[in-house]
Amino acid sequence: MSSLGNLTVLTGPSGVGKGTIVRKILESHSDVWLSISATTRQPRSGEIDGEHYFFLEKKQFQEIIDKDGFLEWASFSNNFYGTPKKIVKEKIEKGTNVLLEIELEGARQIRKSFPEAFQIFLAPPNLYELEKRIRGRGTETEESIRDRLSIAEKELIAQKEFDAVVINEDIEKAFKEIEGFMGLKL
């Protein structure tokens, strides 16, 4: 009988480097599966059902909510998004390590629905550096930057709720630290 996999939740403010860390983990560790969210929004060009998202009708999504079938779910821009419980549990039971990149409220829901998950908060060295990174993307309006920084200030207060806090001052160091928390072999 193989040993169980683990669920690791990665949270942090927009622009902190979560996506980069996730890509590095997936490139380095074929035994890690990135959880796929379900959504009621329409697929964008090039998105594949079951690969990028599980695309559902609102009625289907509501049925899953009613059956307590999500680890977490939320409504955003008139659409629903959620993490299906069944596939995550199946992967863990087969010994696969599951990684979930999610926002703060979702992480809080998972703390209740799957308390054995290891939760990591990825933090910037400071808000000035975070602002520099967000501006460096070149994709945000001034209003969006202000909104993201305001949300980030609130999220940073919540880092004490997490099992581990990793300061992303250097992407390689942060990556190695998260690998260690996930118990991944080199």
Swiss-Prot record:
Keywords: ATP-binding, Cytoplasm, Kinase, Nucleotide-binding, Transferase. Disulfide bonds: none annotated. The lineage of its organism: Bacteria, Bacillati, Cyanobacteriota, Cyanophyceae, Synechococcales. This is Guanylate kinase. CDD domains: GMPK. It is found in: Cytoplasm. The keyword Nucleotide-binding applies. Belongs to the guanylate kinase family. SMART domains: GuKc. ATP binds at G12, P13, S14, G15, V16, G17, K18, G19. Its EC number is 2.7.4.8. It comes from Prochlorococcus marinus (strain NATL2A). It holds the Pfam family Guanylate_kin. GO terms for cellular component: cytosol. It catalyses: GMP + ATP = GDP + ADP. PANTHER family: GUANYLATE KINASE, GUANYLATE KINASE-RELATED. It is an enzyme of class 2 (transferase). It comes from the Bacteria.
